[in-house]
């Protein structure tokens, strides 16, 4: 049996402000730092060990991983950063308040933008200062690889090559893997692992800073999955994520 641990980053400054974040590179709040540290303490207390760690190129996930590994006294572990693990790009919604956007467009439209499988938000213009196409961290990518908006279907298409090319081979090689990423990049992985339908994925929310453990068989098919720590607290945190986009 293999294990895979997925952790959504701790609370970010724009989570606190209830803003659409996407690829905007915002930092953790003091609570987010404590959530990340607590995740590390939980993993250490439960006896988890890792051989390699993966995260995005956005600081809220990278710093979350740092705090997790620091609490585990494993800051020396190899860390792989990949743009493929970035949050879903929220296009022209990036920086906007979710509740105010819901008041303007309606709860149903914002829910579709946030949680449906194939409805992208309005795209950024390529010349919009919020666009990441001039960001040095993406210099090796083609312009088409740096999105102007994404739906979850697009995020799945971006994340899954990383599963096949990096995560799955590492797990099958016996490496103990931890991934610190984002709500929607983790939703993409969970959709694949649990074979969740396009319709049902709308109801899946990932809480900040709580380790999600997958036990996998020899074919990397899930045997079971669970959140470490208080299951009721994890459920409440996921419900809070679901309510963020309501007027």
From Swiss-Prot:
Any GO molecular function: phosphoglycerate mutase activity
Residues noted as binding substrate in the record, renumbered to the chain: 8-15, 21-22, 60, 87-90, 98, 114-115, 183-184
Site (Transition state stabilizer): 182
Domain of life of the native organism: Bacteria
Active-site residues, record numbering mapped to chain: 9, 87
Matching PROSITE patterns: PG_MUTASE (PS00175)
SMART domains hit by this protein: PGAM
Catalysed reactions, as listed in the record: (2R)-2-phosphoglycerate = (2R)-3-phosphoglycerate
GO biological process: gluconeogenesis; glycolytic process
Pathway the protein takes part in: Carbohydrate degradation; glycolysis; pyruvate from D-glyceraldehyde 3-phosphate: step 3/5
EC number: 5.4.2.11
Subunit structure: Homodimer.
Role this protein plays: Catalyzes the interconversion of 2-phosphoglycerate and 3-phosphoglycerate.
HAMAP family: PGAM_GpmA (MF_01039)
Family per similarity comment: Belongs to the phosphoglycerate mutase family. BPG-dependent PGAM subfamily.
NCBIfam families with a match to the protein in the record: pgm_1, PRK14115.1
Protein known as: 2,3-bisphosphoglycerate-dependent phosphoglycerate mutase
UniProt organism field: Albidiferax ferrireducens (strain ATCC BAA-621 / DSM 15236 / T118) (Rhodoferax ferrireducens)
Gene name of this polypeptide: gpmA
